[in-house]
Design a protein with these regions (language model features):
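Active-site-proximal segment of tyrosine recombinases
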Residues: 29-31, 110-112, 121, 129-143, ...
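Catalytic-site neighborhood detector that most strongly recognizes the C-terminal catalytic loop/helix
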Residues: 52-56, 139-164
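C-terminal secondary-structure termini that scaffold catalytic or DNA-interacting sites
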Residues: 77, 165-177
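Exposed loop/turn and edge beta-strand positions of beta-sandwich/beta-sheet ligand-binding modules
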Residues: 13, 44, 57, 79-81, ...
Length: 177
């Protein structure tokens, strides 16, 4: 996020992408996200409470520290009823802008807004042990089978899980001699 970008608009697009990677929002959901959709609980934690644009299903996501930092960056810039990220253009033009961000950052792939949502589902949550049911609710999926598409488990993850299980079971079960 310390990459120098050619203009302010490209920075907003980058920030929106990173915010989606840490909240799971889709392009259509972040494009309509207003400050009124973000609530503070009794502990001072920020939550997005909204309905999916695509399905109308309600979802709730607690902001992780990076997402909270990005939210606060824009919170005082725009009024409460206004959108958190004042995105301009279409899904296609935003993805074209993300290509410029990737080029400035020296990345060898072209990120898309859907990749951000996919990253949240796989790398940020499921790979870190967040239960599939929780991820499904945060993504606003109506059926858990939709979330299972994101849950392709790698051999590394299986190995890590079995090592953790082995440590938990160590000494509990014994084979008779």
């Amino acid at each position: 996020m310390d990459v120098e970008l050619p203009n302010y608009r490209t920075g907003i697009n980058r920030d929106a992408f990173v915010f989606c990677a840490f909240t799971g929002l889709s392009y259509s959901d972040i494009a309509k996200l207003t400050h009124a959709d973000i609530h503070t609980d009794d502990n001072g934690d920020y939550w997005i409470i909204d309905k999916r644009q695509k399905t109308g299903t309600q979802f709730r996501v607690k902001l992780l520290p990076i997402a909270e930092m990005l939210y606060k960056r824009y919170k005082d810039t725009y009024r409460t009823g206004e959108k958190v990220f004042p995105l301009k253009g279409t899904y296609k033009t935003l993805n074209m802008s993300l290509r410029h961000v990737a080029r400035h950052a020296g990345l060898s792939f072209n990120p898309t807004m859907h990749m951000a949502r996919h990253t949240f589902a796989t790398t940020v949550t499921l790979a870190q042990g967040v239960p599939l049911e929780t991820v499904s609710k945060m993504l606003g999926h109506k059926r858990i089978t939709t979330t299972q598409i994101y849950a392709k488990i790698t051999n590394d993850k299986i190995g890590q899980d079995m090592t953790a299980l082995s440590e938990k079971l160590n000494g509990i079960f014994k084979v008779a001699q």
